[in-house]
Design a protein with these regions (language model features):
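PLP-dependent enzyme catalytic core of the Aspartate aminotransferase-like
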Residues: 1-4, 85, 126, 135, ...
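Short amphipathic alpha-helical segments
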Residues: 59, 85, 286, 290, ...
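Conserved C-terminal alpha-helix-loop-beta "cap" of PLP-dependent enzymes
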Residues: 301, 309, 315-411, 415
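Conserved N-terminal alpha-helix of the aminotransferase class I/II PLP-enzyme fold
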Residues: 46-98, 120-128
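Short, acidic Gly/Pro/Ser/Thr-rich loop/turn segments
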Residues: 25, 43-47, 235-236, 297, ...
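N-terminal "arm"/small-domain region of PLP-dependent enzymes with the aminotransferase-like
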Residues: 2-68, 76-77, 411
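Conserved PLP-enzyme active-site core in the AAT-like
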Residues: 2-9, 21-25, 87-317, 325
Length: 435
């Protein structure tokens, strides 16, 4: 019997997160670990070789702002884990979202976005991108008639998050993808809170997936980065909405990204144009750290979820708690069904609860936590807590906060991987301190 080739094996997630991009030892040094390539630029073999690289005829390295071998392995690996054809790593999650929007919409265009998204993304769409002529309409992601009614002739995409921020509502990716595709526009999904280990949005109809790699991918609160994954499934030539992707690009000798770079047209356009010209480049050191994070992603996420579900049960029975916002205990039949469909192995280690007593009591509770750290990050192996109304969503007015499900007494928790008894004891001590 002939030996089955490595690339032909149906490898599982836990194996892919360790091997994709470097299936064999480094060909130059025989190192098994991915090397960190700290170089600003790359030597061309001759002038023709250089010209071919710059003309996109040869897909090799040109300059460190655009590509790097360490980054390339990270991009290959996260693309494989998400089920995409290509990925682009950038300097932050905010940069990933900004590039995704700027590659899909220009001045005079429009984006429909769920209103239960990260405060920074809300601010980008509501206040920053309008300065560049890109408008946004925020919708209830569970009101499908409202979503469809918000789509206009100049709408270029719908954007949602797999799990809402900060209350972890589960959205129906397939349903919203169907609405987007009915109108000939792509669906962008921020999968930061779920990770591809729990949910792979592309399998449910998403066209573009983005992550703040700072969160679960890195996992240890050490490194800033973001990533865009191109599903390769959206047909950019189906209409005249994206001429910059379809028509010959004068800055690349007439290359048509949709025709010459398919199926990875979207990711290639961002790298070749936006990254080239605005340079939100990820450091190869950061890419290396994210690769190390991916190697333990499944193990960490399992523990995060296990601990979170136990904390949810504890908070449900805590008399000082008014309400716990977590899909696993939702009384809404739609949420129950969506959680079962998209999160069969559980999910939502970042969630909120409402404490009795208002904003002052919420802040007093947080100030009495010791094991939990008060900081703006989430998805660290260490447990974290924050008061969203005065921090992550502070740019929103009172009406906007309530519209996003954030009250003055809302506390967001990001449950880490510590021993669950220690996590619950810390919460119990904080409740006791504010009695």
């Amino acid at each position: 019997m002939s030996k089955k080739h490595y690339a032909d094996r149906n490898l599982k997630f836990e194996t892919l997160q360790l091997h994709v991009g470097q299936e064999q030892a480094d060909p130059v040094t025989d190192a098994r670990a991915v090397p960190i390539y700290l170089t600003s630029s790359y030597v061309f073999h001759n002038c023709q070789h250089a010209a071919d690289r710059f003309g996109l005829k040869d897909a090799g390295n040109i300059y460190g702002r655009l590509t790097n071998p360490t980054e390339d392995i990270f991009e290959q690996r996260i693309a494989a884990l998400e089920g995409g054809v290509a990925a682009l790593a950038v300097g932050s999650g905010a940069a990933a979202l900004t590039y995704a929007f700027q590659a899909i919409a220009h001045a005079g265009d429009h984006i429909v976005a769920a209103k239960n998204i990260y405060g920074g993304t809300y601010n980008l769409l509501a206040h920053t991108l309008p300065d560049y002529g890109i408008e946004a309409t925020f919708v209830d992601p569970f009101n499908y008639e409202e979503i469809e009614a918000a789509i206009k002739d100049n709408t270029k995409a719908i954007e949602i998050e797999t799990l809402g921020n900060p209350n972890s509502e589960v959205v129906d990716i397939e349903k919203i993808a169907g609405i987007a595709h009915k109108h000939g526009i792509p669906l962008i999904v921020d999968n930061t809170f779920a990770t591809p280990y729990l949910v792979r949005p592309i399998e449910h109809g998403a066209d573009i997936v983005v992550h703040s790699a700072t969160k679960f991918i890195g996992g240890h609160g050490t490194t800033i980065g973001g990533v865009i994954i191109d599903s390769g499934k959206f047909d950019w030539t189906q209409s005249s909405k994206w001429p910059w992707l379809v028509e010959p690009n004068v800055s690349y000798h007439g290359v048509s990204f949709a025709k010459d770079c398919a199926p990875a047209a979207f990711a290639t356009y961002i790298r070749a144009i936006l990254l080239r010209d605005t340079g939100a480049t990820i450091s190869p050191v950061h890419a290396f750290i994210f690769l190390q994070g991916l190697e333990t992603l499944s193990l960490r996420v399992e523990r995060h979820v296990e601990n979170a579900l136990k904390v949810v049960k504890y908070l449900e029975n805590q008399p000082q708690v008014e309400k716990v916002n977590h899909p696993s205990i939702s009384k809404d039949p739609e949420q129950q069904a969506l959680y079962k469909k998209y999160f069969p192995n559980g999910g939502g280690s970042i969630f909120t609860f409402e404490i009795k007593g208002g904003a002052e009591k919420a802040q007093e509770f947080i100030d009495n936590l010791e094991l939990f750290s008060l900081l703006a990050n989430v998805a660290d192996v260490k447990s974290l807590a924050i008061h969203p109304a005065s921090t992550t969503h502070s740019e929103c007015n009172e009406a906007e906060l309530l519209d996003q499900g954030i009250k003055p007494n809302t506390i967001r928790l990001s449950i880490g991987t510590e021993n669950i008894d220690d996590i619950i004891e810390d919460l119990a001590e904080a409740f006791k301190a504010i009695e």
